[in-house]
Structures are given as structure tokens and as C-alpha cells.
Amino acid sequence: MVDIIFHYPFLGAMGDHSKKKPGTAMCVGCGSQIHDQFILRVSPDLEWHAACLKCAECSQYLDETCTCFVRDGKTYCKRDYVRLFGIKCAQCQVGFSSSDLVMRARDSVYHIECFRCSVCSRQLLPGDEFSLREHELLCRADHGLLLERAAAGSPRSPGPLPGARGLHLPDAGSGRQPSLRTHVHKQAEKTTRVRTVLNEKQLHTLRTCYAANPRPDALMKEQLVEMTGLSPRVIRVWFQNKRCKDKKKSILMKQLQQQQHSDKASLQGLTGTPLVAGSPIRHENAVQGSAVEVQTYQPPWKALSEFALQSDLDQPAFQQLVSFSESGSLGNSSGSDVTSLSSQLPDTPNSMVPSPVET
């Protein structure tokens, strides 16, 4: 918290901060005496010039309008202090806001969306069992699978994980380390051991118990030993193998479902809306609109050319029509000349009368 204090400067000799006289104010930032009218004080007893109190990272001036943080003798604004020294998510390394809900695992803090298994990426919900291994979250199924692989892959490694067993050597009483040849020989004996064959009744009993609880406790295993007549080791190995097979099967089914979903949603690598092609149609039928009747004026020379193309021409009348057209007196002649000329022409439809035609 930054406070502004009205200061009356003390006109005394400047001295050390530890030996300052009553009424003097020494700036923590520059170490000189403060003669300004106002002093910026940071709780509990740190006093600054107004020009000296600023963030050590972004050089933003700090006053009573913002929050000031002091760490190792340096002042920071709230944004830089949270970025540098605030608690961050152990998964995404992003800070938290005051409204975020978090999940804690020992000393690590996670966002709710980041609290997932590092193997199968399944989100861990409240009530789920998980393990924290080298700052990585593991769900119960993946943790058990990891223990099984460690037990099968490195049986003689120092500090075995729970559930892992080493090789049983005949000369276990001797404290000497077995030679490399003996170790290879024992490995060969392990690969050629006799497999345990289960009958139908034993298999049905184990499957029924597995459907009820894939991870039976010690009491349930003792009951299975009495019911099936098998050794505890055979029952434990059968449950381990069954869980491993179901895990692989579920992963394979999930991959197949994702592949089918991606095949349906994409076409040759391009994602879009699927369309169905229809039958081909004529172009004019596809044009939408209403028919419009267009009327044009037919000039006189067109009627004259149509009259000239007729086969049964009356030569005297045609010669008179041609001479009449060439004289150019169609528009200047009297009405009687036009009437007499029309009476001499053969009776043909639309010979000289302009009529509207459809185009």
C-alpha cells in the first residue's frame, strides 16, 4: 500500500539513514533526503521520492492508485509481481487469476482443465484416484500399467516398484552376485516355462470377479484361490494380463472411432459440407423469370424484300412497286397514289402493313 504524506522539510544536516534526525525523511530508492512537499510511504516505514517509486521491471510509476509489492529491496507493480513470483500452473506454466478454481497435488497447483493424466490425457475429476510421479499426473489405470511394465521389463533393477518381483535363483543362500552366464541361463528358463492352463469353470469364475472388480483386494484373491484351486501368483498375473488387454482394446477402439469421424467430416483432406450431385438439366430451364413480349416495328423495305422473294410475281405490278420504292416518294405522295398502287398488288398477307412480331 502506498500512502501520500504531506511533508515539512527539515533544514538540518544530511546524515546516514540509520542516524537520521527526527523529522528527516530519507528516500529508500536513491538514498538522499526528501525535500519534496509530498512523500510516498510504503508500509511499514519505507519512504520514497515520487520520482523514485517505480516498478523495477516495467519502470511504471507507482502511486496511491495502484498496488505496490516489495521483494528483495525492489518494488514491483502487481502485474509484474504476479508474473515473476506468483504461483503458476504446474502443467501450462500460466498464472492464476483471483476467480480461477484450482486443483492441488502436494506442492503443485493446476488449472481444472490442466489436471489431466499425462498418458491418456483424461481429465481427473474430484474423487478419482491418481498418482504423482516426477511431477506428472497418472490416473489409476495408467499407473497400474506402468507398474506392470516396470515389473516385467526390469525385474532386478535396484529399488523395485511395488508389485515387481525378481528372478528366483536356486542358490539364493549365497551372497555373491550371479555371473552373466547364469543370468542369461535363467532368462532362457523364464521364457520356456510351462504355461498354466485354466479350465472352463476357473475361467468363468475369474471373469465374473473381473467384471465386478478389475482390481480385487487381498481378501477377494484369497477367496478366488479357494474357489479355483489356483495359486495366488497365477491369479495375480491373470488379472494383470486381463487389465492390459482391455486397456489396449479400449485405446484401439478410440483410435478407430476418431478415424471414422475424421473420414466422414473430410473429403480428400478438405473439410466442408457434403453435397449430392443431381441429374443434368437444360440451361434455359434453369433460368427463373417470366416471359416478356417484345414488339418491334417492321420497316417498309423488309416487306418489299419478302414480296420480291415470292415465286408468283406479277411483273407489271412488281416493276411499278420497285420504281415507286426507288423514287423515294413514299412519304410525299398523295393518298390516291398509294391506294391505286395497293389495288394493283396481289393479295398477300401483311404485304406492306407493319405488324408486331415476337422475337
Curated annotation (Swiss-Prot):
Residue ranges, annotated region (LIM-binding domain (LID)): 272-301
One MF term in the entry's GO annotations: DNA-binding transcription factor activity, RNA polymerase II-specific
Annotated region of DNA binding: 191-250
UniProt cross-references to Pfam families, sorted A to Z: Homeodomain, LIM
Biased composition (Polar residues): 337-359
Domain (LIM zinc-binding) ranges: 25-86, 87-149
Source superkingdom: Eukaryota
A cellular component annotation (GO) from this entry: nucleus
Phosphoserine, modified sites: S154, S157, S279
Region of interest (Disordered), residue spans: 151-190, 326-359
Keywords for this protein: Developmental protein, DNA-binding, Homeobox, LIM domain, Metal-binding, Nucleus, Phosphoprotein, Repeat, Zinc
Gene Ontology process terms (BP): negative regulation of neuron differentiation; neuron differentiation; neuron fate commitment; positive regulation of transcription by RNA polymerase II; retinal ganglion cell axon guidance; spinal cord motor neuron cell fate specification; visceral motor neuron differentiation
Subcellular location: Nucleus
Primary location: nucleus
UniProt biased composition (Low complexity): 326-336
Complexes and interactors: Interacts with LHX4.
Function recorded in the entry: Transcriptional factor that defines subclasses of motoneurons that segregate into columns in the spinal cord and select distinct axon pathways.
Protein name according to UniProt: Insulin gene enhancer protein ISL-2
